[in-house]
Amino acid sequence: MATTEAQHSRLPYRAIALDLDGTLTNNAKEVTPLTRETLLKAQADGAHIILASGRPTYGIIPVADSLGLEETGGYILAYNGGKIVDCKTMEELYSNFLPAEVIPMLHQYARSKGYALLGYAGNEIVTEMPDDQYVKEESRINHMNIRKVECLTDHLEAHPTKLLM
């Protein structure tokens, strides 16, 4: 059976899953032009791009946008797979929340040890310790503002997927 040029140009893969930090992005947390061009071609050849990260959804969206995933129908696996989002529709396809009874225990433990604990509320990081170096780094990486709160548990999303200590 003869194979056409068009068949050769199609990738044998239907999906390409990529970790972000240190894999897809460089040290500046950016996708290089060559990588972007390669992934755009892969999408044109029929591959779906899946961005997988421990980052919150909001912190992955700029990378997804830079790769045109809102048009091509890629996916975001945020919070280390705790939330899966269809980039074309922004529909949550899957969510796995922290058990409600664990949140006060984590909060109390962090307070007792003097550790920063952060969570997310929309496009913001919420924390009682906004000057902590790790809170600032999370803000920088994800391009999210930090909001200082008196009591973290009063300001979290209704069903948090991730807290970071």
Feature roles, as predicted:
Residues 27-31:
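Conserved ATPase-coupling elements of RecA-like P-loop NTPase cores
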Residues 82-165:
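HAD-like small-molecule phosphatases
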Residues 34-46, 105, 109:
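Catalytic-core regions built around general acid/base machinery
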Residues 1-20:
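Non-catalytic pre-domain segments flanking phosphatase-related domains
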Residues 56-76:
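Substrate-recognition/cap helix-loop segment adjacent to the acidic, metal-dependent catalytic center
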Residues 11-13, 46, 73, 114, ...:
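A general structural motif
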Residues 74-84:
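A short, structured active-site edge motif that brings together acidic residues
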Residues 39-62, 118-120, 163-165:
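Substrate-recognition element of Asp-dependent hydrolases with the DxDx(T/V) motif
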